[in-house]
Amino acid sequence: DGALALISAGKTDAKLFGMIKKDIKAKGPSYCTSKNVGGCAKVTITLLAAGEPTTYGGTDYAKPVTSLPDSALKERPFHQALDMIALERLGKPIPQKLFKSITDYVSARPGRNYPSTDGLMLAALSHVVSTAYGQEGITAVKAALVKRLDADRQTDGWGWPDHGANVRATTRVAPGLYRAGDANHKDQAVKGQAWLAGQQQVDGSFPSNVVSPAWTMMATVQAVPVLRGLQSLDTIGANPARAVTVDGWVPPRRLV
């Protein structure tokens, strides 16, 4: 997240990219595993945003995402949203089984709300196109997510109901609504961005709902892209998400 924050702020010098690659070389292989395909997707997104190949230090970080084992569908829904965004940045179609898993998640009623997951998933779905028949299904999934996020709106930010808005949820929700929402929800996203700016502390940091230095740092680096044009994991840096299909249907040129 720190690397993506710097890239979103226009820090694209060779020194930064050297630091990113050094960090990936040291930690990437243990982060990207068969049990954590979402981690592979996150590294893939970071490398693509930096304009770098997705194979580094002898490890092909994109391969677990493009091959997408069934075990990936048992990971958290947030990871599946990361898988979608990595595929979209690669210009690859979304596997039917991944889209079905996401549809099942949206159709179910989770025990609690997950605005961060729903917001990132909405951003990912905003790049998926299909035939007129299939598009109805995509539109319905997005509408269901928007409805859930309506319930999670707290003043001009987002968070769990009865807990108030929080920075990290708002950093995921605002870009998603801006990509996929109607005019009213786009306006909410812009207001959410303004709310986020108002949370900055005197020392420049942003507060987290968990009080610790590590969580404060995470909230801060996740806020930076949103403040700079409602950027998120799908749009930061080079190789932004492209319009893709489910299982490879080729859209008319006007939709690409």
Residue ranges and their predicted role:
Residues 1-14, 31-56, 71-96, 108-143, ...:
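An alpha-helical repeat/solenoid feature that recognizes helix-turn-helix modules
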Residues 20-24, 64-69, 102-106, 145, ...:
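Buried hydrophobic core positions in alpha-solenoid tandem helical repeats
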Residues 159-161, 196, 250:
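Short linear interaction motif-like sites in intrinsically disordered regions of transcription factors
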